[in-house]
Amino acid sequence: MRCRIAESDVELETPLVRAEVGSTLLIGIRAGDILLATVEPAGLSARNIISGRVLSVVQRDVIVVVRVNCGVEMEVHLTLAARDSLQLQPGHAVWLIVKTHSCHLMAAS
């Protein structure tokens, strides 16, 4: 099932749910379930590959919080090692990778 994020062009493939076309759904994605790539990925089973730009990279203890603008603002949690190997900086182009089953229906109306 394809769902458009409100007030954006971003679409996510989510698990099938019983919802009317045009319904409002609240979809939750854990920040730690989002992968980041610095080159456009190919040949993946993940159905959601979204391009964006890094807004900020902030270390909070042993977690790195990366904020990405991909038409909407998304928060991604990385390890220190992942941050270091990706060499992320604000303004860098990235791709967010989200498996369909990492998109959880929280509410529908």
Tell me the role of every PLM-derived stretch.
Residues M1-C3, S23-T24:
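Conserved active-site beta-strand-loop modules that form the wall/rim of enzyme catalytic pockets
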Residues D9-V58, V65, H77-S109:
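Glycine/charge-rich catalytic "coupling/switch" loops of P-loop NTPases
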Residues M1-R2, Q59-R67:
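Short aromatic-glycine-enriched beta-strand elements
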Residues R2-I5, L16:
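Short charge-dense sequence patches
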Residues I5-V10, N69-E73:
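Glycine-centered tight beta-turn/hairpin loop motif at sheet-sheet or coil-to-beta transitions
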